[in-house]
């Protein structure tokens, strides 16, 4: 009996510390990219397309949009589309997916690919959902430099900061 208890104790000691421990690099990236305060002066994605000549821009957008997957599960990259109008944003009981005005606006809205890079210019190798705790439908403010590709009608934003406005 004593041997069984000793064996069980050893087994529990061995597996007790096997939980997932987040790499310290993730915290460093969060500290680098997560904006504590909601920045002022955001523009729409449509406006950002005309200002995407290499200058830093600040957009308010909704995570998700376009066809296909919103997130890349290998790197910190995701799609965003136009955020709901400010008068609709955060209204109790408002469902942008069921609102005819929001649906009409979003139907033809451009999509943006947002990516986060390391200091040496490589894509951060962590799913943005894990790194930043975001999900489809969140409204975010993204700060970064953009480039617009006319052939794909896609704005690509190399993000330097992000603030989650609403979940």
Q: Residues of each region from the PLM?
A:
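Sec-dependent bacterial lipoprotein signal peptides
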Residues: 1-18
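OB-fold and OB-like single-stranded nucleic-acid-recognition modules
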Residues: 18-167
């Amino acid at each position: 009996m004593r041997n069984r208890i000793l064996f069980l104790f050893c087994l529990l000691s061995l597996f007790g510390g096997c939980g997932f421990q987040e790499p310290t690099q993730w915290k460093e990236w969060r500290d680098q990219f997560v904006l504590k305060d909601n920045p002022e002066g955001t523009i729409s994605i449509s406006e950002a397309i005309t200002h995407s000549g290499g200058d830093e821009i600040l957009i308010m957008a909704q995570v998700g949009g376009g066809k296909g997957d919103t997130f890349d599960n290998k790197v910190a990259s995701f799609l965003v589309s136009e955020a709901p109008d400010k008068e609709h944003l955060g209204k109790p009981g408002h469902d942008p997916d069921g609102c005819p005005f929001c649906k009409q606006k979003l139907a033809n809205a451009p999509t943006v690919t947002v990516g986060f890079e390391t200091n040496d210019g490589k894509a951060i190798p962590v799913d943005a959902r894990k790194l930043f705790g975001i999900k489809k439908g969140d409204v975010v403010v993204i700060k970064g430099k953009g480039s617009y590709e006319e052939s794909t009608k896609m704005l690509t934003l190399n993000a330097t900061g992000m603030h989650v406005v609403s979940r």
